[in-house]
Design a protein with these regions (language model features):
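Extended glycan-interaction surfaces of carbohydrate-active proteins
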Residues: 1-70, 92-126, 130-143
Length: 145
């Protein structure tokens, strides 16, 4: 646990990681849990850029500038927004990341936010699965809790 009350990558690595959104998405914790809220806020603040989400921020080694936003993480943030009752925000995250596919409709692993280019493995099955899961979740009627 990070001193700010959010989760961190590991006991030895205090950085935030977008994969830490999964406990809320999968229902392991309620979205109003203080740790979950702090983690979601940190992901938005530290990892989101121009509508895309990085998995985590890399250190200053030479390859860090070559890393792009991880498209799956943008779909995760859309799902978290929906779970938190922020349907309009969820739609924005979904549409922004859905639009980052190639001409054939295929997603890569990463997206270069600055150069507006697809990066990484093509096609990336995890991103396609995440996009489909997010589309299904966003199309479901709101739950009355």
């Amino acid at each position: 646990m990070h001193p700010t009350g959010r989760w961190q990558r590991s006991p030895a690595d205090p950085r935030v990681d977008a994969a830490l959104l999964l406990p809320v998405i999968r229902g392991a914790l309620p979205p109003d849990d203080p740790r979950a809220r702090a983690t979601v806020a940190a992901v938005r603040e530290e990892l989101a850029e121009d509508g895309y989400v990085y998995r985590f921020r890399h250190d200053a080694r030479p390859l860090h500038k070559a890393e792009g936003a991880f498209l799956l993480c943008g779909f995760w943030l859309a799902q978290v927004a929906q779970v938190c009752g922020q349907d309009v925000e969820a739609a924005h995250w979904f549409e922004r990341n859905r639009a980052a596919c190639g001409p054939a409709g295929l997603f890569t692993e990463e997206y270069d936010v600055h150069q507006r280019q697809l990066r990484g493995n093509l096609p990336q099955a995890f991103v396609h699965a995440g996009m489909l899961e997010t589309a299904v979740r966003l199309s479901e009627p709101a739950r009355a809790d």
